[in-house]
């Protein structure tokens, strides 16, 4: 609840001055403390003069002796036939609570109830009270009275006001009587709270557009509540109710003129407020039987609950209506006995049961009609009469639900009264009693029903410190109960309450709800499912986030007529709505409601309506992105740029409009116009799909999905592109049809989205997207991980953000908030900029109507949806939607066309003559279109290499040939797909150049996923890799194999076949065209840096330098799972380089980066290829062991007789034979160290190959590979795996190298070594010198 005011409600009673008739006015209004004080003084003086004949003991309160009874007058009665039983039930509840304490007050003083003399005129409540005062001078208080009329009469009596009597728990039906008066002690919440509970339910649950309010004028009941009702409904943007009002009369006739005026509005909810009387009873009968009102919800106040119950079931038993569960909903300030969680109700049941059995004062025959209705329509079985008192009590409670609730209300008041009499000094006289009652009292009844705080006059300091001032009522809450099978049941979350700091609810308002409405197309199952998806998603999101800023309600309306007008009527006729979500149709203009992310059964162009806000990609945006990213689409199967659009079920004007926009997109990016085919709705699109082209299909149906799948299975190069709306609607059908098809088919069904991948539940995806984390936590069921559910969650969150903004600026329009904010971010997902309006300048007028805001749109395939490790097809793009004319040469003049025609014949002859020569000359030419050629623009270079290729060739020669061929095919296909350029290959290594850093990164990541998914036809490669890792465990103390100890399931998900490492770097290069190779090559620092980056990576790992990483846009970086590896040292680089691991396959673990310490360092002018550089000579003198050490000793012994220079020359044939590179010697390295380094390197190679060949036969079966002592320049290096691995990335580790200035010599695939002085130490090569 919201409380705007903290001032208590106080009454400056005109009746205190003896002015007659004032009671019929509203007696409650705000007044200052000064005014209140003045009026109290004046009133006191007037009262003194008016009651000079009253005994003085009345004012001060006579002091009672310690054994004298505590006298209380029972004024809880009514003389009306309609109200007498009502008041009787309240009194029995009060009496049962006093019976429970033995009618005993403090120090054993008996409590004596004074019953009015039946011979007196009981209608004159003032006379009844004055007579009791006269007969019992120590009378402490009055219980009651019953009804607002009698209470008003008491309050205008000067004698009673001056007596100091406390009126305890008066039963009133209108808030007009609730005001500060020190003689009144209310023990029920004010009736205004009942109105608030009703309005809350109407706004949040019924969401009814048409309400009615029925009350009687001329009495306190109704007038004040009608005013409160209108104020509350206006604050929630609800229409004011239709009104039936008639003057109170003893006549029971219904004013049919007033009733007809109300009934003709066809109210959905009718609130009835009034005195329980014959006039109200007749009105209820008319309401429940008139066809205009009989189906409406009936909401009586608590005072009318019993009467409404009886009339309803009397009509049912007479055959005039059929009871409907939940049609009758009553307000109350206490719970019915069916509420299971309330402790005080269990206490009530026990005390009232004992009271019934022991006193016999409860006569069930008084309410026999209620019992008869329950016996016929209720769920209880009447227990046979017996001596069992428990059965008797249980029968009574079951068969008298309304009487029981009245008894509960009375019992709560009686229990509070009993507590006020529990201390002797409180009840010495009326003055002491009243002082106690208003001394900041709070009461707890039955352990959990709280009343209070009650407080009297106090100053501002006390109020500031927390005191409750001028407060004579203790209830602060109300609830609603629904009537189901003659049983009252509390409606969950129907209650309202306000802070106990405030005495009355004046100024307390209800929070505005956020109401969603979704249309359910009942005759179209897929469209209906989309609507239900929105309802489920929004409700679940609200529950998960525990959103309580305002009530959020998601309702649905079933529709069969799907014409725009019918849908408009469905939205606007019956329900209060803020937001319309889900499926809509073109032309359904629902002005006044926000329509975010509309889903169209037949996608169409943006509707320029201010309240339509497109959060998902529009058709125009998707067509723009299609041509902007057409090269990526073409690369899937390497087809040309021809686009064929198929429009299914569109009218001719829509075909023309959509075609025009698509052609503008094609012209903007200098592509030829698409071909267009319109397919009628009576056919499927199968026959219209074009072979070998990109098919852009709109309005896909379930039958179309089957045609598309069959078409793609047959056509190996064709591609089908669908839009986001069709994806949402047909997603279940698409996934079901494609999940069993080959990946090559799944990869050729492509769509658009600006959402994170809904099916990606990996940790890296959650780390990159807050929206995805919330989505999967709120909806953990994998069947709900669909684009429809995710877009619904996002839409709901967007609208909730707009509601918060609207409330903060006291606006009623969510649409206004969208354009006021312009750019909106929800769960870190940006939208906008939304603009709507015109700007006028002295010379011109500019208008912008921009109601769409999707950003970061990507293209992705169904393959990626089924397998999140597959990269998305394109980088994120926020289309500018700036169209340009196609850029091409001017048309030929007529003369030029004539000359061209004349020359065609000659040209044909020439072409035929030179065709053979041209073909011959062009056979060796390379396609250089994709090569970056501008030396002023940065180029991104990739280097790749296969891990342990030498060892694999030695161990599996019969398999490696096919494996290398497959490796080359995969990489070359991807190079073409991403528009990159193959510079050269050296052995199994690739050098690749890309114009775009994102293309390079996407290429590198997809290399890993493609190789993972490739069918290698053998497991021998994986067994060999695992054995290589295990062989290192015994060699290195803290080495932990990254993959060898994985379970089969884990390994199969992360690794398969050849392991390729990739290094990426971006920078400026020296670009040269090679006349021999007829291709472009790239030289300089960028090439060297990329090669060195690849050299430090592990197999299956992609490492990018910070230059490559920051060359990506913010959106591109956000879409890439990565691990920052910190600064790393690279050979030949005089500074540490920040490295980033790209997590192409989530879950892979790698050894630490291969930043080995070099000792054999070439001269500044030395160069080497990327692969050779990665295996430079190690500082291995005295460090190698095992077989390699033995081989090195033999070599050293054999060559020892020769001088050092001759030894180096004699080693060259052996080095060449074993494929070991011999880089030039650096000036910083001695000849002896250089010689020993060459022999060590040769020894390691010999040991590796010989041991690898032993255990693996030609059939591919592997046995234990004992290679723990072998090391190679590529991977079989004992230092390469040093350290342990970490999840999803290699541990950052610095090499500690000291760099020297790099060489200026350009080289495409060679690397400079880092200069480092190796300490002098004796070696086998200089044994002779040592002697």
UniProtKB/Swiss-Prot annotation:
Pfam families: Guanylate_cyc, Peripla_BP_A-cyclase, Peripla_BP_A-cyclase_1
Membrane-protein topology: Multi-pass membrane protein
Chief location: membrane
Lineage top rank: taxon: Eukaryota
Binding-site residues, Mg(2+): 945, 988
Example GO BP: cAMP biosynthetic process
Underlying gene: RAC-B
Entry protein name: Receptor-type adenylate cyclase B
Taxonomic placement: Eukaryota, Discoba, Euglenozoa, Kinetoplastea, Metakinetoplastina
């Amino acid at each position: 609840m919201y409380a705007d005011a903290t001032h208590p409600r106080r009454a400056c009673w005109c009746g205190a001055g003896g002015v007659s008739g004032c009671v019929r006015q509203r007696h409650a209004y705000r007044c200052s403390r000064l005014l209140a004080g003045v009026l109290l003084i004046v009133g006191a003086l007037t009262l003194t003069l008016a009651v000079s004949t009253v005994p003085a003991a009345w004012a001060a309160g006579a002091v009672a002796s310690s054994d004298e009874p505590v006298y209380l007058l029972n004024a809880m009665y009514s003389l009306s036939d309609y109200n007498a039983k009502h008041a009787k039930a309240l009194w029995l509840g009060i009496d049962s609570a006093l019976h429970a304490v033995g009618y005993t007050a403090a120090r054993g003083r008996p409590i004596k109830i004074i019953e009015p003399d039946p011979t007196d005129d009981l209608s004159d409540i003032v006379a009844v009270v004055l007579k009791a005062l006269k007969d019992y001078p120590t009378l402490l208080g009055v219980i009651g009275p019953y009804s607002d009329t009698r209470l008003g009469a008491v309050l205008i009596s000067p004698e009673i006001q001056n007596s100091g009597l406390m009126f305890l728990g008066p039963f009133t039906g209108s808030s007009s009587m609730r005001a500060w008066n020190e003689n009144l002690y209310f023990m029920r919440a004010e009736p205004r709270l009942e109105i608030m509970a009703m309005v809350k339910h109407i706004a949040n649950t019924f969401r009814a557009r048409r309400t009615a309010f029925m009350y009687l004028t001329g009495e306190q009941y109704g007038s004040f509540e009608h005013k409160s009702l209108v104020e509350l409904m206006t604050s929630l943007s609800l229409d004011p109710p239709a009104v039936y009002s008639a003057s109170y009369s003893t006549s029971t006739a219904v004013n049919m003129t007033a009733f007809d005026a109300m009934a003709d509005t066809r109210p959905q909810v009718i609130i009835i407020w009034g005195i329980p009387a014959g006039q109200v009873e007749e009105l209820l009968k008319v309401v429940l039987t008139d066809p205009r009102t009989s189906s409406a919800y009936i909401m009586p106040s608590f005072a009318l609950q019993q009467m409404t119950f009886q009339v309803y079931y009397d009509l049912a038993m007479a055959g005039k209506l059929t009871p409907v569960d939940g049609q009758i909903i009553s307000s109350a300030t206490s719970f019915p006995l069916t509420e299971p969680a309330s402790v005080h109700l269990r206490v009530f049941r026990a005390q009232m049961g004992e009271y019934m059995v022991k006193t016999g004062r409860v006569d069930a025959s008084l309410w026999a009609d209620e019992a008869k209705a329950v016996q016929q329509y209720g769920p209880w079985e009447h227990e046979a009469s017996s001596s069992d008192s428990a059965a008797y009590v249980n029968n009574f409670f079951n068969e008298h639900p309304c009487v029981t609730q009245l008894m509960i209300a009375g019992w709560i008041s009686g229990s509070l009264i009993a507590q006020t009499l529990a201390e002797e000094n409180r009840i010495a006289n009326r003055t002491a009693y009243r002082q106690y009652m208003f001394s900041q009292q709070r009461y707890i009844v039955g352990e959990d029903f709280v009343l209070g705080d009650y407080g009297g006059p106090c100053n501002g300091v006390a109020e500031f410190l927390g005191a409750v001032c001028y407060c004579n009522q203790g209830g602060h809450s109300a609830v609603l109960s629904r009537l189901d099978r003659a049983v009252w049941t509390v409606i969950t979350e129907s209650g309202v309450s306000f802070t106990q700091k405030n005495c009355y609810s004046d100024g307390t308002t209800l929070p505005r709800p956020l109401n969603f409405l979704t249309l359910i197309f009942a005759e179209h199952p897929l469209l209906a499912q989309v609507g239900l998806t929105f309802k489920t998603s929004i409700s679940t999101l609200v529950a998960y986030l525990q959103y309580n800023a305002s009530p959020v309600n998601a309702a649905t309306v079933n529709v069969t007529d799907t014409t725009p007008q019918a849908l408009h009527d469905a939205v606007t006729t019956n329900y209060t709505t803020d937001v319309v979500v889900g499926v809509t149709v073109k032309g359904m203009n629902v002005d006044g409601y926000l329509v975010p992310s509309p889903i169209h059964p037949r996608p169409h162009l943006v509707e320029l309506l201010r309240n339509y806000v497109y959060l998902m990609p529009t058709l125009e945006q998707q067509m723009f992105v299609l041509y902007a990213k057409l090269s990526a689409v073409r690369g899937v199967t390497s087809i040309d740029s021809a686009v064929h659009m198929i429009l299914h079920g569109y009218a001719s004007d829509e075909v023309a409009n959509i075609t025009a926009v698509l052609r503008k997109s094609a012209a903007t990016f200098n592509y030829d116009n698409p071909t267009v085919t319109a397919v009628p709705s009576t056919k499927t699109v199968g026959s219209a799909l074009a072979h070998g082209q990109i098919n852009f299909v709109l309005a896909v149906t379930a039958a179309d999905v089957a045609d598309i799948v069959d078409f793609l299975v047959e056509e190996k190069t064709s591609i089908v592109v669908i839009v986001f709306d069709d994806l949402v609607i047909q997603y279940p059908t698409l996934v079901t049809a494609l999940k069993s098809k080959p990946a090559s088919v799944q990869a050729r069904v492509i769509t658009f989205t600006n959402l994170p991948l809904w099916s990606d539940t990996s940790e890296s995806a959650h780390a990159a997207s807050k929206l995805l984390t919330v989505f999967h936590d709120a909806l953990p069921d994998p069947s709900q991980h669909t684009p429809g559910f995710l877009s619904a969650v996002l839409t709901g969150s967007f609208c909730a953000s707009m509601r918060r903004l609207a409330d903060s600026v006291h606006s009623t329009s969510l649409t206004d908030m969208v354009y006021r904010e312009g750019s909106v971010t929800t769960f870190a997902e940006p939208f906008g900029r939304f603009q709507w309006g015109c700007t006028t300048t002295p010379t011109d007028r500019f208008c912008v109507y921009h109601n769409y805001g999707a950003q970061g749109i990507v293209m992705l395939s169904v393959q990626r949806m089924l397998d999140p490790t597959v990269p998305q097809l394109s980088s994120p793009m926020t289309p500018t939607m700036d169209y340009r004319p196609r850029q091409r040469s001017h048309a030929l003049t007529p003369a030029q066309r004539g000359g061209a025609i004349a020359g065609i014949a000659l040209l044909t002859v020439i072409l035929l003559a030179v065709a053979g020569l041209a073909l011959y000359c062009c056979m060796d030419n390379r396609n250089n279109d994709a090569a970056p050629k501008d030396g002023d623009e940065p180029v991104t270079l990739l280097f790749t290499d296969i891990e342990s290729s030498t060892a694999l060739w030695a161990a599996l020669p019969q398999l490696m040939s096919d494996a290398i061929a497959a490796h080359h095919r995969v990489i070359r296909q991807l190079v073409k797909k991403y528009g990159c350029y193959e510079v050269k290959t050296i052995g199994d290594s690739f050098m690749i150049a890309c114009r775009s850093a994102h293309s390079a990164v996407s290429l590198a990541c997809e290399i890993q996923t493609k190789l993972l998914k490739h069918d290698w036809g053998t497991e021998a490669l994986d067994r060999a890799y695992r054995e290589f890792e295990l062989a290192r465990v015994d060699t290195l103390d803290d080495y932990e194999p990254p993959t060898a100890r994985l379970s089969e399931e884990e390994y199969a998900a992360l690794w398969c076949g050849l392991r390729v490492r990739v290094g990426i770097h971006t920078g400026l290069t020296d670009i040269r065209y090679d006349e021999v190779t007829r291709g472009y090559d790239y030289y300089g620092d960028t090439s060297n840096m990329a090669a060195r980056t690849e050299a430090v990576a592990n197999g299956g790992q992609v490492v990018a330098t910070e230059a490559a990483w920051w060359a990506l846009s913010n959106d591109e970086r956000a879409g890439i799972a990565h691990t920052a590896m910190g600064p790393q040292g690279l050979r030949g680089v005089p500074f540490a380089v920040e490295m980033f691991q790209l997590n192409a396959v989530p879950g892979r673990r790698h050894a630490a980066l291969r930043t080995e310490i070099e000792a054999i360092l070439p001269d500044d002018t030395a160069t080497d290829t990327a692969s050779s550089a990665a295996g430079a000579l190690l500082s291995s003198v005295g460090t190698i062991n095992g077989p390699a050490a033995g081989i090195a000793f033999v070599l050293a012994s054999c060559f020892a007789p020769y001088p050092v220079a001759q030894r180096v020359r004699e080693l060259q044939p052996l080095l060449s034979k074993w494929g070991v590179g011999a880089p030039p010697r650096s000036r910083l390295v001695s000849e002896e160290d250089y010689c020993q380094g060459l022999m060590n390197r040769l020894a390691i190679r010999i040991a590796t190959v010989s041991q690898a060949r032993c255990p693996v036969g030609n059939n591919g079966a592997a046995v234990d590979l004992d290679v723990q002592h072998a090391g190679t320049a590529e991977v079989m290096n004992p230092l390469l795996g040093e350290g342990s691995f970490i999840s999803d990335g290699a541990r950052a580790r610095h090499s500690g190298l000291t760099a020297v200035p790099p060489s200026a010599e350009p080289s495409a695939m060679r690397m400079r070594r880092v200069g480092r002085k190796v300490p002098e130490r004796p070696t086998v090569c200089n044994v002779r010198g040592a002697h």
